[in-house]
Amino acid sequence: SQDDEIKNFIINVKNKESIDQENLSLFINSENNIFQCLQKNNNLVATTLISKLDQQDDIFYLEILDCEFGPDSNFGTFKVASDYFYNLLNEYSISYKADFLNSDSSSRNFYWHNFFNSSTDRDNFYASWIDSEDSIEIKDLFSEQSECFSSNSYIGYKVF
């Protein structure tokens, strides 16, 4: 049905060395009747801050938050908070991964990607983590460091 149509998608290249950059650029910039790129950001660098996945499945659930550091914060202070978050998550049986993406170290804007292998993993994360005292503490700590403006959820597909 039309409700099941994919209207938006994201191409996220994890390993730039394994893909022909010229062909990728031709694909993204091509004029065609199938898709149009609304936003291009080829210079984002991803850093995995939290990984509690044994392996990432070929189909996964992804939440993308668009954020900005506060005036007294930067990647270093945010990394300390994310390390604390990771240590707290060890108390929970949660399958989860988080990536931090930004264009360069001087940029105040960044993306936070939450990865889950299944909707069950995602639901378990929210059910067991979100209402916990640890979660409230981390939410407050992250709120002191940054502000997020939007959050969107996607189904991700690994392409070989």
Regions found by a protein language model. Give the residues of each.
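Short S/T/G/P-rich N-terminal loop/turn motif that feeds into the first structured element of a domain
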Residues: 1-136, 141-160
